[in-house]
Amino acid sequence: NALKRGHVNSITVFSKCHHGWAYHPSEANEMHPGLKFDLLDAEIKAAHEIGVKTPVYLSAGFDEKIAHKHPEWLRRPKDDRIGWEYPGFHELCMNSPYLDYLIAQIEEVVRNYDCDGIFLDIVGVRTCWCQNCVKTLLDEGKDPYNDENACELGERVYLNYTRRVREAVDRI
């Protein structure tokens, strides 16, 4: 009733949070251990019953669960410090196998749910000095610690990310 009274026409519902948990049964991820039902499906159905659209949120750049399982997928600063000693979330590099993991989650949501869009957060052009980014630049004969080279690679990595997401959604 509150949504109708407030003339709300769209609400963002969660597939995956910054902690990395899915809010629905998932083969591409793990469902939140405290959840015993498909919260995403219930939210979408309830919203659609009253004419409210439901874009689905996936935290793309942050996934603490996978960051701890695969620290080699983390985005690294030039000094190569991960930053575990500081509170907060740790960003993942889209030039790592994490991108395949994320694409599988996006495909699963688009294929299995009547969503009205996808909201991917914490993404953009980034500089990174993880082993994948350093290797890419070295393989190209470039100095990986030259900021201009790192920025140019960051633009290519983001372009590849956007292309892969678009291709995944268009396939479904």
Walk through the language-model features, giving the residues of each.
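Hydrophobic faces of well-ordered beta-strands that scaffold small-molecule active sites
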Residues: 11-13, 54-58, 118-120
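Active-site neighborhood of glycoside hydrolase catalytic domains
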Residues: 91-172
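Acidic side chains
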Residues: 1, 38-41, 63, 116, ...
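Short C-terminal domain-edge/linker segments immediately following a structured domain
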Residues: 17, 42-43, 85-89, 148-152
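Active-site-adjacent "subsite" loops/lids of carbohydrate-active enzymes
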Residues: 56-113, 163
